[in-house]
């Protein structure tokens, strides 16, 4: 059994929240994980800070690793990590056939399975979607490197002291990941810039694609084109690939010659296209309909098809209200849905969650100053307001991005003016009891589309959203991008050279430099 598979079994046992059962399952899992494994001690390392401008992906990773504070170095085969110095005497490292795991010692000593903090593994194949598993590097021979994190409790809940220490150590795990160095031949450390990093080197299988959603399949297919320098008319795709350190867009779509593809790339494209078609067939909603036409859908899962007619009625104040007629009965939804500048040619029928079997009617409004919003209603003998989502989460309205890829959730957009005006992904969850959409707060949010900014000078950034976290220095360069934000004071910045880290912003100033953002970055966008 593979290292990661064993760890995932341990996670599932932890989810049950019962300590005795957790201990039993973790003991069994640890036995499988370790096999002929052995405990290892790390040794102190006193490497100096590096500051170069080399832009190869392996060198960038090493520079970032070297920039992290001194600590305790540990090497397993070709993987080296640095643990925080304050962890001395508090951790246990256990090796397996395909990697190693790091534990909190006090929990591990009680039971070999508790105290799991993270693991690193090197396997001979690519896989996508395993629980708690993140690809950090891949090699030309097709092998892949992963780091693995717990997805739930991994300590003795009845020991307050052990729990406190575990939580403090867990907060520092991202710092360990930032120190990873891999010395293997042909290793590429920009794996996070790909959906399928080996699609130009290895044949894809259907199993590799099983856990990919609609958006990931679209990006994976276009990755094959992007590797050959194709540009994109789709704004989202162009923005997405511009952020990748490996991408150089040189060929316009109309000039691109597909003869540059290898036979394997062509086969992989066919595989991805077939998977996209299968996904669409398995997920028929949302469906787009024109106003003023009679449609038939079973809205309330009673086995009977409703006849639905929707139109728009203009009000005296210039706003619009959708008029919904179901089975000959007209419903007034004006209390919950006043459209300022509606999308007039269509509405949608959606299926936010398959669990309830119900469908929703969705109406789109551009708002007073292009602030798009989507209103959802359900039918249960009467029309009930489900809620609204900022943005239009429909592929044909949203640069091909599907906002319904997670069952029970709608992905819209939210606005930030933290450093500049920008839009990020927002998430709304359907409450199964109240049938209402509820906005979900996140620790950080992904920018939807970003433009390149010139970085005028060296910029110190942090490996986590913590002003005391280890520091990485970004070199001044022509292209940097904003990737994520907590919407409060932190923005994840990435350079075209591959370096990245969190920048703290307060009152329009970059904290680490004490300068106005306009004096650090070019072309910041501001609008009402």
What annotation goes with each model-predicted range?
Residues 472-527:
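SH3/SH3-like beta-barrel superfamily modules
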């Amino acid at each position: 059994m593979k290292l990661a598979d064993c760890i995932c079994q341990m996670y599932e046992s932890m989810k049950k929240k019962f300590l005795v059962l957790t201990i039993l399952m973790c003991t069994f899992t640890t036995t499988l994980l370790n096999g002929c494994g052995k405990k290892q001690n790390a040794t102190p390392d006193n490497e100096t800070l590096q500051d170069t401008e080399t832009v190869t992906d392996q060198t960038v990773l090493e520079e970032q690793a070297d920039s992290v504070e001194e600590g305790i170095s540990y090497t397993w085969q070709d993987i080296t990590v640095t643990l925080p110095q304050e962890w001395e005497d508090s951790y246990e490292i256990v090796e397996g056939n395909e990697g190693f795991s790091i534990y909190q010692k006090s929990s591990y000593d009680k039971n070999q399975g508790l105290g799991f903090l993270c693991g690193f593994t090197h396997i001979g194949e690519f896989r996508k979607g395993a629980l708690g598993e993140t690809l950090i590097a891949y090699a030309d021979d097709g092998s892949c490197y992963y780091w693995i994190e717990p997805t739930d409790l991994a300590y003795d809940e009845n020991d307050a002291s052990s729990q406190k220490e575990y939580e403090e150590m867990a907060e520092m795990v991202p710092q360990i990941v930032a120190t990873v160095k891999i010395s293997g031949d042909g290793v590429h450390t920009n794996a996070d810039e790909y959906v399928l990093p080996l699609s130009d080197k290895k044949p894809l299988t259907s199993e590799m694609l099983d856990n990919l959603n609609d958006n990931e399949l679209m990006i994976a297919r276009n990755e094959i084109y992007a590797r050959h320098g194709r540009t994109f008319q789709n704004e989202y795709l162009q923005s997405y690939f511009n952020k990748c350190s490996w991408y150089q867009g040189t060929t316009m779509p109309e000039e691109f010659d597909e003869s540059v593809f290898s036979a394997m790339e062509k086969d992989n494209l066919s595989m991805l296209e077939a998977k996209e078609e299968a996904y669409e067939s398995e997920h028929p909603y949302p469906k787009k309909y024109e106003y003023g036409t009679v449609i038939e859908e079973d809205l309330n899962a009673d086995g009977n098809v409703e006849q639905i007619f929707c139109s728009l009625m203009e009000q005296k104040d210039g706003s619009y209200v959708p008029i919904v007629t179901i089975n000959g009965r007209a419903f007034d939804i004006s209390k919950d849905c006043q459209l300022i500048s509606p999308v007039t040619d269509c509405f949608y029928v959606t299926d936010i969650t398959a669990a309830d079997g119900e469908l929703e009617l969705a109406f789109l409004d551009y708002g007073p100053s292009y602030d798009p919003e989507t209103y959802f209603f359900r039918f249960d003998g009467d029309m009930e307001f489900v809620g609204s989502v900022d943005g239009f989460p429909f592929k044909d309205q949203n640069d091909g991005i599907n906002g319904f890829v997670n069952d029970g959730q709608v992905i819209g957009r939210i606005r930030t003016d933290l450093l500049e005006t920008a839009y990020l992904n927002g998430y709304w969850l359907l409450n199964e009891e109240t049938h209402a959409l509820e906005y979900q707060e996140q620790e950080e949010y992904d920018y939807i589309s970003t433009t390149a900014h010139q970085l005028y000078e060296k910029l110190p950034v942090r490996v986590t959203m913590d002003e005391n976290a280890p520091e990485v220095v970004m070199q001044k360069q022509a292209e940097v991008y904003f990737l994520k934000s907590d919407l409060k004071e932190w923005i994840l910045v990435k350079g075209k050279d591959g370096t990245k880290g969190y920048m703290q912003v307060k009152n329009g100033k970059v904290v680490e430099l004490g300068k106005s953002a306009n004096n650090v970055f070019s072309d910041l966008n501001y609008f009402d």
